[in-house]
Each structure stands twice: as C-alpha cells, then as structure tokens.
C-alpha cells in the first residue's frame, strides 16, 4: 500500500510539472504580449505609464533615485519601483 501511495504522489508531481511547462510562454512571445497589453488602449498616453524619479532615503541616509518601471532592476520580473542607490 505504501508503494502505491508513493507512485500516486510521483504521478501527481509529474503531472503538475508537465502542466506548468506546457503553460509557459516563450520569452519572445511574452514581450509581444506585454506590448499588446500596453499599447492596446489608444486613449491612454504612454507618458502616463512613466512616473518621474522621486527622492527617497536609503538606510545610510543618502538620497536614492527611485522610479516605477518594468524589468529595469536586476532580478525584477515585472513592473514595480526600482531604487538605484
């Protein structure tokens, strides 16, 4: 019975991995999808997506430049606030 439980668990894990891989989007298609999403609304100007830098202090007290951007900082996987210290 224990062997059967292990076999079922392995089958479930393998099925989950296969589903995850099949639902992944290749990198070049992902960029095209993002461009379609960003430029799909003609009424929204591109400038409204770009937020200017604003000042923020880091732990040492020196000012840091932060802005909202997409994939502009290392290890960033989407859009968010990026601060370069």
UniProtKB/Swiss-Prot annotation:
Pfam families hit by this protein: Hepcidin (PF06446)
GO cellular component: extracellular region
Propeptide cleavage-removed residue intervals: 25-64
Disulfide bonds: 66-83, 69-72, 70-79, 73-82
Expression (tissue specificity): Expressed in all tissues tested, with highest levels of expression in kidney and lowest levels in liver. Intra-peritoneal injection of lipopolysaccharide results in increased expression in heart, spleen and stomach, but not in kidney or liver.
Residues spanning the signal sequence: 1-24
Keyword check for Disulfide bond: yes
Cell compartments where the protein resides: Secreted
Alphabetical UniProt keywords: Antibiotic, Antimicrobial, Cleavage on pair of basic residues, Disulfide bond, Hormone, Secreted, Signal
GO biological process terms on file: defense response to fungus; defense response to Gram-negative bacterium; defense response to Gram-positive bacterium; intracellular iron ion homeostasis
UniProt cross-references to InterPro entries, sorted A to Z: Hepcidin
GO terms, molecular function: hormone activity
Main location: secreted
PANTHER family, per the entry: HEPCIDIN
Family stated for the protein in its record: Belongs to the hepcidin family.
Stated role: Seems to act as a signaling molecule involved in the maintenance of iron homeostasis. Seems to be required in conjunction with HFE to regulate both intestinal iron absorption and iron storage in macrophages.
Subunit structure and binding partners: Monomer.
Protein name: Hepcidin
